[in-house]
Amino acid sequence: MENIRSFMSFPASRKVYVEGSRPDVRVPMREIALSPTKTPQGEVENKPVRVYDTTGPYTDPDFEPNVEKGLPLLRRNWIVERGDVEETEPQSTAGRAASLPFARRPLRAKPGKVVTQMHYAKKGIITPEMEFVAIREQIDPEIVRQEVAAGRAIIPSNINHPESEPMIIGRRFHVKINANIGNSAVSSSIENEVEKLLWAVRWGADTVMDLSTGKQIHETREYIIRNSPVPIGTVPIYQALEKVGGVPEKLTWDVYRETLIEQAEQGVDYMTIHAGVRLHYIPLTVNRTTGIVSRGGSIIAQWCLAHHEENFLYTHFEEICEILKQYDVAISLGDGLRPGSIADANDEAQFAELETLGELTKIAWEHDVQVMIEGPGHIPMQKIRENVEREQELCHGAPFYTLGPLVTDIAPGYDHITSAIGAAIIGAYGTSMLCYVTPKEHLGLPNKEDVRVGVVTYKIAAHAADLAKGHPAAQQRDDALSKARFEFRWNDQFNLSLDPERAREYHDETLPAEAAKTAHFCSMCGPKFCSMNISHELQRKIKEEGMKEKANEFVRGGSSLYR
C-alpha cells in the first residue's frame, strides 16, 4: 500500500480539533486556508473554511499510520467509565480461532445492563458520543439526545469499535453517505479492501459497509474495523451463507446467531437484517419485471420456499434484539423486496415489506436497539416523494437509508449519475443516509477509482439535499467557493471543491502555467468573453459613475457635510 498520509491529505488543509466539555472530546474538522482578496485598496484576508472531516487520525500529522496496529481507541474510556460493560472470551468459533495482530478481548454488556446510545438517551443522559456529534453538526447536544431517544436518529457505535469517531444519522442532521466495499469469490484481497476503506473515508464516506462474499471474510472485516474511523456495516446473511457452503436451504438460526455474535464481537456498528421478507409476500414478486434483486432478500426467499416456513429472521427478531443490544449494534432493516427496475417501483411487495419493517422497528425500540430503515432502489422521480412519506408514517420516523434511487434504467456505466439524481431528491425530502452507487453498478466489482467517483458523486447529492433542507452550515462552503470563483482565485476554487485534484487537473489540461492561476479567464471563454471578468468591469464602472454622481450632489448641495 502506498504511503497512507500522502494519499489521505488535501491541499491547503490542516486538521483542527474543537474541544468539548471534557479534554477527550476533541472533534476533528478540516480547515481550508484561503488566499486574500485583491482590491484597489490592497489585500483583504479571507477567513479559512472549516468542513466536516471523515478522515480520522490519518490526516493528523502526529499520527503514524500502521494497518497492522490499527487506530487509537478513541471511545474506550467513555465506554468503560459508564460501568455497564465487561470483557469476555469470544463466544464465536471464528473469534476464538482468529490469530490476527489485534489481540483484544471483546466487550459485552454486564448482565441486566443495556449499553445502547438509545438507552442512555431515554434515561436523559447526554453521552460523550452525543456531545461529539453535536459539535460536528453544530447543533445543541440536547437536540441530539432527544432525536436519539425518539428513534428519529441513530449513532452507530458498537462498544467493540472504539476506534470510530461518533456520527449521527437522522433527518435533522447532515445527510450522510455510505460506501460499499468488500471482496467477492472472484476478486480482491485484504490489502485491496483496506485501501478501498481508506480511499472511501478520504473522499468523505460517513459509513462503510463490508459486503465481502469471498475468502477470508472474518480476517478482511477485522482489518477493516480496526483501521476504520467511521462506523462499519455488514449483511450477516452473506457470511452465514458462506458457512453452509453457499446453499441457502442449509441456513439455520443457529448458524446465523453465531454469525451475529461473531460480527458484534469484532465491532460491526450496524447490520442489515432482512427480517421483513415474509413467506406470504414472496408470491407478490412473481410478476415483477426483475423479481427479487436484493441478495439478502433472494437468499431468504429461497430458504422460505424450500422449507415452506416463515423467515427465521422474522420469527427470531426478539432474540436478534437481545443479542445486539449487548454490544450497541444498530439494526438496518433491509429492504429485501425493493424494486430492481422502474417498472416495479412502489408495488405491493415493496410496501407490504415496508409495513412489516415498521412493526419490527417498534419491537427493536422496546429493547432500546437503534434502527434505521433501508429503501429503494429504482424509482422514477415522480414516485420518490411517496417513498419518504410512507416510510415516515409506517416506520414511525425512524431514519431512512436508501440506495439511490436510480431514476432510469437505461444508463449502465453511468448509474452513479442516474442514482445521484434520485438521491438528491430523496435526501431533500428527508432521507437521512444515501448508499452510494459507482459507475460499475450492475456491471462488476468497483475498484479504487470507482469508489472515488461514487463517493464524490454522492457527496454532491447529499450536500445538495442539505442546501434544500436549509441546514445552517451547508451554504458556507458554497459561498466561499463562489466568492473565490468571482475573484479568480483559482487555487482557492480547487481547494474548496469536493475533489480538488480533479478540478485542478481539468483546468490545467489547457492552462497548465502557474500564471494561469491568477488569470481572469479560463479556456472556456478566453480573456475577451469571460462573463465574470466583464461583470467586474461593469461593477467598476457603476461604482465610478456612482461616485461621480455623489460628488456632483455634494457640490450642488454647497459642499457642506452639515446642513
UniProtKB/Swiss-Prot annotation:
Keyword Glycosyltransferase: no
Binding sites annotated in the UniProt record for Zn(2+): H378, H442
Biological-process GO terms, alphabetical: thiamine biosynthetic process; thiamine diphosphate biosynthetic process
GO MF entries: 4 iron, 4 sulfur cluster binding; carbon-carbon lyase activity; zinc ion binding
CC cofactor: [4Fe-4S] cluster
Enzyme class: lyase
Cofactor note: Binds 1 [4Fe-4S] cluster per subunit. The cluster is coordinated with 3 cysteines and an exchangeable S-adenosyl-L-methionine.
Assigned protein family: Belongs to the ThiC family.
Described function: Catalyzes the synthesis of the hydroxymethylpyrimidine phosphate (HMP-P) moiety of thiamine from aminoimidazole ribotide (AIR) in a radical S-adenosyl-L-methionine (SAM)-dependent reaction.
Protein name (record): Phosphomethylpyrimidine synthase
Species per Swiss-Prot/TrEMBL record: Geobacillus thermodenitrificans (strain NG80-2)
Lineage, broadest ranks: Bacteria, Bacillati, Bacillota, Bacilli, Bacillales
